[in-house]
C-alpha cells in the first residue's frame, strides 16, 4: 500500500491512472445506463418524473467520463507508460510532481460525486452555464462542490501537462531530434500544450462563477452590469482546445492501429546519405554507388576502428586499422567504395587509407550527421575544421546532431565487426551439470558514450555496466530469450570479419543445446570443446 501511495515511478503512476480510469468508467457507465433506460420509451420511466435528478445524472455522467475516464486513461495512463520508453528516458522529468498529479484526482472525483448528493444535486449540464448555475437556480452547495472538483482536476491536468512538455523537450535520447519522435509522443506533447493553454481559461471562468455565487460579484449577472455570454466565450475557447486534443489523439491512435494491425512494421531510416550520393555521383559518375546497407555497416565499422587523422604537418587522412587476419574486410571496403588503398604494416596489422582530398570530401559527406558516438563526433569535427581550412571545396556545414541506430539497420552489425569494441559471442557449460549460459558482449570506451550505449543496449534487450578497465563500458545481453533477438538480428544482417565464424560456431552450439543435445554426457563434452573455439 505504501508503495502505491508514495511511488514516483512513471509506470506505477500510469498503472494507478488506468485503475482510476476503469473505476470512473464503471461509475460513468452506470450513469449512462440510467440515462438510456429513462430515454428508452416515451413518458416517465424510472426516475418518477424527477427532471432535476435526470439533469444531475446527465451532468455527473459527462464530468466523470471526460475528466475522470478519458483524460486520465489516455494521457495519464498511456502517456506515463509509453512516452519515457519511446524517447529513451528513465522516468518523467518531475517524478514527485507526477505523484501529485495523480493523487489530486481521487478527491476531485469524491467532490464531484458529493455534488450529486448535496441538496438536489448539480443539474446544470456539463457546461455549467449561468444563469442555470447561478445562485437563483441552484441555491445549495452542489454547484460549488462541482466547481471545486473541476479546480482540482484542472490543477492535476496542468501539472501533468508541464511534466510531459518538460520530459519530451529535455529527456530525449542523444540524436533523437523532434522530427524523429514517434507520432504518439507528438500527440501527447501537443495535447499537453493545448491543455496548458486552455485549462487556466476554464479555471478563470469557473472561479468568476464561484464569486458570483458566493461573494456578490456580477461577472455574469446582467443586473450588475455583467454578461452571461462572457462565460460562453471563455468556456467555448476551452472546449475548442480540448476537442482539438481529442482529434489529434484519435487520429494518432488510428495511425498506430493501421500499422500494428497490418502485421508489418514501417521503420524510418535514421541515416541520411543523400549528400554522400550527390558528391559520389559527381566524382564517379560511371561507377556503381555503394548500397545503403553497406554504408550503414561502414559507419558502424568506422565508429569502432576508423580514425580521422590530422598529422603534425597538417596532412589529413582517414584510416581504418585491422588485424591482417581480417584484411579481406578492408579489401571489401575498398571494393565497395571504389577508392582508397589497403596496405600492410608488419605481419599483424593492415590498414585502409584515404588521403585524396576529393575522396575525403566524399567521406565527410557520408559521416556528417550520421555519427552515433559523441567521442567519434568530436574527432570528426576537428577533422572537418582542418579540412575546411586546407581545401578549396565549399565549406562543410557541420551537423551537430547524433544519429540513433535502429534494430533494422546495419550499423550495429558493422560496430560488432570492428576490432576495438571487442564484440564477442560467448557460451559456458557450467561444471558437470546441465546448466549453461549464453552471452553477447560489446565494449566501448568513454564516459560520454555511455548514454548512447544504453540506447543501443535497449535495442537488444541488454544492459550497460562498467568494465574492469577504467573508463570502459560493456553492453551485456544475457538469457536464452534475449539470444533469440540477437540471432534474429545477425541472421538478417551479415558479419564480414572473423566474428562471422565465431557467430556460426556459437549459433551451432545454441541450436544443439536448444535441441537438448547437452543432456548427453558425450555430446556435452563435445560442446564444451566447441565453446573454446568460438572466439579463437
Swiss-Prot record:
Location in or out of the cell: Mitochondrion; Membrane
Keywords, comma-separated and alphabetical: Endonuclease, Hydrolase, Intron homing, Membrane, Mitochondrion, Nuclease, Transmembrane, Transmembrane helix
Transmembrane segments: 15-35, 56-76, 99-119, 145-165, 183-203, 234-254
Any GO molecular function: endonuclease activity
Catalytic EC class: hydrolase
Chain positions covered by the region annotation COX1 intron 5 encoded: 237-536
EC number of this enzyme: 3.1.-.-
Recorded family membership: In the C-terminal section; belongs to the LAGLIDADG endonuclease family. In the N-terminal section; belongs to the heme-copper respiratory oxidase family.
Listed name of the protein: Probable intron-encoded endonuclease aI5
Organism: Mycosarcoma maydis
Source organism phylogeny: Eukaryota, Fungi, Dikarya, Basidiomycota, Ustilaginomycotina
Gene (UniProt): aI5
